[in-house]
């Protein structure tokens, strides 16, 4: 039995690019202004680093995520922006297998690792650039040599945690 992509929440590549961008901006607008600015700055830096990558967007219960992939499959993501009310991070889908001689990766699961991003400048640090290069090098399917990637809205959850920090 084939899965119905609409039921799974995937809007895949059927959405017009302008509509996908508008929807993505609405996801980002849910965050506090400082996190909106950070998400946009990190996205700009990652688009520059991976100009041919597809961007897979998820607005799920716990996190907003934007993955940079060689295909339309989440497992092919090299890195992702992951954001919640607690801040913004750079997630490595296969981070548990990456060399981390500087010990900057956080997380303890079998697969994913991440770093916290206080600013987009963190992406310029040598140890972060090394992790990104290692993640790209271990990708099963390399990024296309040419062309432009597309923005794909993969999943939107009706119920979500707040994207803004709660008042204390």
Predicted regions located by residue number:
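Charge-dense, helix-prone N-terminal extensions
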Residues: 1-168
């Amino acid at each position: 039995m084939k899965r119905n992509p609409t039921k799974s929440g995937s809007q895949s590549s059927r959405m017009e690019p302008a509509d996908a961008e508008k929807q993505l901006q609405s996801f980002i607008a849910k965050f506090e202004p400082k996190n909106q600015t950070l998400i946009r700055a990190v996205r700009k830096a990652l688009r520059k680093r991976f100009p041919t990558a597809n961007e897979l967007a998820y607005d799920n219960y716990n996190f907003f995520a934007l993955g940079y992939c060689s295909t339309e499959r989440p497992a092919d993501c090299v890195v992702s922006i992951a954001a919640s009310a607690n801040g913004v991070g750079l997630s490595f889908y296969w981070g548990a297998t990456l060399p981390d001689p500087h010990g900057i990766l956080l997380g303890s699961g079998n697969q994913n690792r991440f770093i916290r991003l206080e600013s987009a400048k963190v992406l310029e640090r040598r140890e972060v650039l090394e992790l990104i290069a290692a993640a790209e090098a271990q990708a099963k399917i390399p990024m296309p040599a040419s062309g432009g990637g597309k923005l794909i809205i993969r999943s939107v959850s009706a119920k979500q945690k707040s994207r803004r920090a709660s008042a204390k």
